[in-house]
Design a protein with these regions (language model features):
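Non-catalytic, mostly N-terminal accessory regions of nucleic-acid modification and defense proteins
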Residues: 1-191
Length: 192
C-alpha cells in the first residue's frame, strides 16, 4: 500500500468515525446508525453514478435524464448545510415522499428502479432529529467518493466492523448480522 492510499484510508476511517460519533451524540445506537449511514451512502453513491452517466452522455452529445434531479439530487440538498433545519425538514418531507411514493407526480414513477427505491426507503428511517446534527453527518458522508476504489474498499471494511460493533452492542440478539437482501440487490442493480 502506498502512502497516498494509506493516508486516504485513514481519512475515510476518520470520516466514518466522525459521522458515527455525531449520530451517537444524538442518542442513536450502533444498530440504528449503521442503517442511517447505509441509506446516506446509497444516496451519495447513486448521485455519483448519475453524475457519471450524465457526463458520459454529454461526451456523446446525448441527453441524460437524472432519476433524482434538481432539489432531489444529493449534490443539491446535501450542500444546504448552512440551513440544517431546512435540510432535515426537506429530507424527512419532500425527499422521503419522492423516494417512497408510488404516485408518479410525487414519486419517481413506477418502473423497476422506482420500485427498488421504494422497497429500500419504505424499510429504513432517518434517526436524526436535530438539523445541526444531521447536517454534520451529511457533511462527513459528502467527503466520501464512491467512484474511488480506495474509498469503496475501506468503506466495506468499516461496514463489516460496524456490523461487528452492532453484534457486540446487541446482547439480546444472537447470530451474525448481514446487510438486508433488498439493499444489496438494489445497490447491485443501480451500479449495473
Amino acid at each position: 500500500m502506498n502512502k497516498k492510499t494509506d493516508h486516504r484510508r485513514q481519512e475515510v476511517q476518520q470520516i466514518v468515525k466522525n459521522a458515527c460519533d455525531q449520530l451517537n451524540s444524538e442518542g442513536v445506537d450502533a444498530r440504528n446508525y449503521v442503517e442511517q449511514l447505509a441509506w446516506l451512502f446509497f444516496l451519495k453513491a447513486f448521485d455519483e453514478a448519475e453524475t457519471s452517466k450524465e457526463a458520459e452522455a454529454g461526451f456523446d452529445d446525448k441527453a441524460y435524464e437524472r432519476r433524482l434531479s434538481g432539489e432531489f439530487a444529493w449534490s443539491s440538498w446535501a450542500k444546504n448545510t448552512d440551513h440544517p433545519d431546512d435540510m432535515l425538514e426537506f429530507v424527512d418531507g419532500k425527499l422521503w415522499i419522492k423516494l417512497t411514493s408510488p404516485d408518479p407526480k410525487k414519486g419517481m414513477g413506477d418502473d423497476a428502479l422506482a420500485q427498488r427505491f421504494r422497497r429500500i426507503f419504505d424499510n429504513v428511517r432517518n434517526y436524526s432529529r436535530r438539523g445541526v446534527s444531521f447536517a454534520k453527518v451529511v457533511q462527513q458522508v459528502d467527503k466520501l467518493h464512491f467512484s474511488d476504489q480506495t474509498d469503496v474498499i475501506v468503506l466495506s471494511e468499516i461496514y463489516e466492523d460496524l456490523l461487528k460493533r452492532v453484534a457486540a452492542d446487541s446482547a439480546g440478539y444472537a447470530g451474525e448480522f448481514y446487510t438486508q437482501r433488498h439493499i444489496i440487490r438494489a445497490m447491485v442493480q443501480v451500479v449495473q
